Amino acid sequence: MSNEGKCPFNHGKRNGTTNRDWWPNQLNLKILHQHSSEADPMDPGFDYAEAFNSLDLAAVKADLRALMTASQDWWPADFGHYGPFFVRMAWHSAGTYRTGDGRGGAGRGQQRFAPLNSWPDNVGLDKARRLIWPVKQKYGRKISWADLIVLTGNVALESMGFKTFGFAGGREDSWEPDEDVYWGMESTWLDDKRYSGDRQLETPLAAVQMGLIYVNPEGPNGNPDPLASARDIRETFARMAMNDEETVALIAGGHTFGKTHGAGDASHVGPEPEAAPLEQMGLGWKSSFGSGKAGDAIGSGLEVIWTSTPTQWSNNFFWNLFGYDWELTKSPAGAHQWQPKGGAGADSVPDPFEPGKRRVPTMLTSDIALRADPTYEKISRRFFENPNEFAEAFARAWFKLTHRDMGPRVRYLGPEVPSEELLWQDPIPMPDHPQVDEQDVSALKAKVLASGLSVSELVSTAWASASTFRGSDKRGGANGARVRLAPQKDWEVNQPAQLATVLEVLGALQVEFNRAATGGKQVSLADLIVIAGNAGVEQAAAAAGVEITVPFTPGRGDASAEQTDVDSMAVLEPIADGFRNYLKGAYTIPAEKLLIDKAQLLSLSAPEMTVLIGGLRVLGTNVGDSKHGVFTDRREVLTNDFFRNLLDMGTEWKPTSEANEAYEGRDRATGELKWLASRVDLVFGSHSQLRALSEVYGSEDSQQKFVRDFVAAWTKVMNADRFDIKHN
């Protein structure tokens, strides 16, 4: 039998069966190791901030401004101006952000990769990115795709006569798709299995359907009901961190420009980029309708031009919204849209490609919602009557949209960073006094250890302060000491009564030190909370026979209540923290999967997660002083007992109820009860990869390594939000 023409590799034409195929519910640790240095083509030590700061931003903007009206034959510009197209590109890059877990957003240039590059709502944006490639090519590593996409949106607005609020660089590109983001359970584009009950949207999702950035512009599931659309809009934009005023400003501001595309039936449109043929070179949605571009373009299927000034900032969106009575119609592609009743407004908007030809203004169901909903209507009418207020609101909302996932202002780069400090940035005052030195830190540790507070209390408080950090949107963390403020001080997971006691003692020590210090030296409570936690770790390590100093870098500030948005901060409350063996309620997602999610948000690797679990259990950080997972008779001593006893084959484990949430471990020989455990505890002996890690730390020769690795992982969490210092 001839083998001619056969692929020599088994993974050629067919994909082999994977572990995920065999065990679809298997715990996925890969999300803890994504975006590794092996995937990054930049040189070791490449400093993007340094590269960006060497950039001539004015020159980049000049090149982008010239590009706006340099229409290309391969993808001509509507109205001779790419500005509206680029606004949509930037909007859709940033608009995937959701507050529930801080994931999505413009921060890593993920629009370049699947699935976002092939979402139905992103149809055509493959061309937008190709149009700005010459600019990216010219400036290379000095500006990331993530920054360039947002900057291009800003320049587009400015080139159309709008004054933006500012721009900050600092978004570093990733080089592979995010694997940690849950976009929904649906397996079909535009499906909406994410709803339950009375249209209750699944957490943490924000978009209404798979493959949409926010809402269906035709109305819920294509039903052209403006009031129902308003309900979806309010829910979705709230989950994008926008209030009603910001929502109206963004929709009306964005729809001041450009048009949608629905020249023909969607059956003419070819596959999305990820499914397109090789020769299309990463471009998708190739259309067989006419020329497939310009006036023949098919995108959403809607054919809408909102204003008479589609390439110029104006108040015409509201003029049209309130100036006409609207009736339902359909686009050439059959999509629901709206036009003025009785033929009003005919010839009031320009055609995008035929000079002198005029059209009737049109609106989306999601636009009419701004008039139908009473609250949105009041805001819209106020903006209509006060165009300067509208412009200011849109400028601020656009800046928030495109910068929401960047974290604190210390990460902002470039000459156009606004000087104004905004509440949604979670501002923290920068210390303006001399910092404590090593001698001071040693003295403070001694005071803390003599205060009567236990190791468990010290470590628990520091963890509560630091573990709010989310690597997704760079929010939370120990800096600011917001653990002492609402809402964090009242979260069940933080054990409010114990927390108040610890903070009272630490607050008194802070006052005592600051009064006695000379030369203006001060210690912030944020720093002291971490110092106290470090002291607890060091004492516990010493009790286990290992002398070690936990690294500490001063410089944290203390945020005030006025600098803290309680509602915005509330989204950081964990529904689960496996590191403290805590579940806020009963969930369909197993506790061990919630642990992996928490570890990923903390930017921890699987070994770091493992060693932290083992250490925190024996240090006594469980919420409510639960005994689950405390596999030691030497509590508050930093031993590897958790792993040694977890791996002991002399223990037999059984669930304590049909819920399979809690377990008891009994001596195989005597039946005597030895330990209690949660799902989070037992997964470190059950899951093959986690067991392999546990075996490292449960070995006879691992005690010192265990302590060293715990201290390293602990310090990483304590410093996770310290963007003011260089991380190794």
Swiss-Prot record:
Iron in keyword set: yes
Cross-linked sites for Tryptophyl-tyrosyl-methioninium (Tyr-Met) (with W-91): Y214-M240
Cofactor descriptive note: Binds 1 heme b (iron(II)-protoporphyrin IX) group per dimer.
Active-site residues (renumbered): H92
InterPro entries linked: Catalase_peroxidase (IPR000763), Haem_peroxidase (IPR002016), Haem_peroxidase_sf (IPR010255), Peroxidases_AS (IPR019794), Peroxidases_heam-ligand_BS (IPR019793)
Gene3D superfamilies in alphabetical order: 1.10.520.10, Peroxidase, domain 2
Post-translational modification: Formation of the three residue Trp-Tyr-Met cross-link is important for the catalase, but not the peroxidase activity of the enzyme.
Family statement: Belongs to the peroxidase family. Peroxidase/catalase subfamily.
Protein name from the UniProt record: Catalase-peroxidase 2
Species, as recorded: Burkholderia cenocepacia (strain HI2424)
